[in-house]
């Protein structure tokens, strides 16, 4: 399933909100976001289970929970409006659902930036099979 997700991200390219999320991550961390976080820990990328492994993985857990609260659109599809103003990410647009998705991504990008010191390369390409502890509630 993870291979399919990587292929989907590559096919999306510069279209869709995943590239927008990657741009936000890049602005807040200075690293290429999507590839650095897509399969990090137990929660970054498609799906998630178990307990977050560190603060970076917790950013993804909270992001997943945020997406779970979005109503009216698919959080992984569509394009939202946002801009960077004085180093801050500002979500805009008239569609309340896409604006909510943007806010989820904005908060996650900020979280990644604030927790870069917890990023551990051993959790890159981490297998969900190794996430065995009971999952937390959102």
Curated annotation (Swiss-Prot):
Active-site residue list: 63, 105
GO biological process, one term: arachidonate secretion
Keywords from the named record: Calcium, Disulfide bond, Hydrolase, Lipid degradation, Lipid metabolism, Metal-binding, Secreted, Signal
Entry-linked PROSITE patterns: PA2_ASP, PA2_HIS
SUPFAM superfamilies with a match to the protein in the record: Phospholipase A2, PLA2 (SSF48619)
Stretch forming the signal peptide: 1-16
Catalytic activity reported: a 1,2-diacyl-sn-glycero-3-phosphocholine + H2O = a 1-acyl-sn-glycero-3-phosphocholine + a fatty acid + H(+)
GO cellular component: extracellular region
Cofactor: Ca(2+)
GO terms assigned for molecular function: calcium ion binding; calcium-dependent phospholipase A2 activity; phospholipid binding
Enzyme Commission numbers on file: 3.1.1.4
Residues bound to Ca(2+): 43, 45, 47, 64
Disulfide bonds: 42-131, 44-60, 59-111, 65-138, 66-104, 73-97, 91-102
Cofactor note: Binds 1 Ca(2+) ion.
Tissue: Expressed by the venom gland.
Subcellular location: Secreted
InterPro entries documented for this protein: PLipase_A2, PLipase_A2_Asp_AS, PLipase_A2_dom, PLipase_A2_dom_sf, PLipase_A2_His_AS
Family: Belongs to the phospholipase A2 family. Group II subfamily. D49 sub-subfamily.
Annotated function: Snake venom phospholipase A2 (PLA2) that has enzymatic activity but is non-toxic. PLA2 catalyzes the calcium-dependent hydrolysis of the 2-acyl groups in 3-sn-phosphoglycerides.
Name the UniProt record assigns to this protein: Acidic phospholipase A2 ammodytin I1
Organism (species): Vipera ammodytes ammodytes
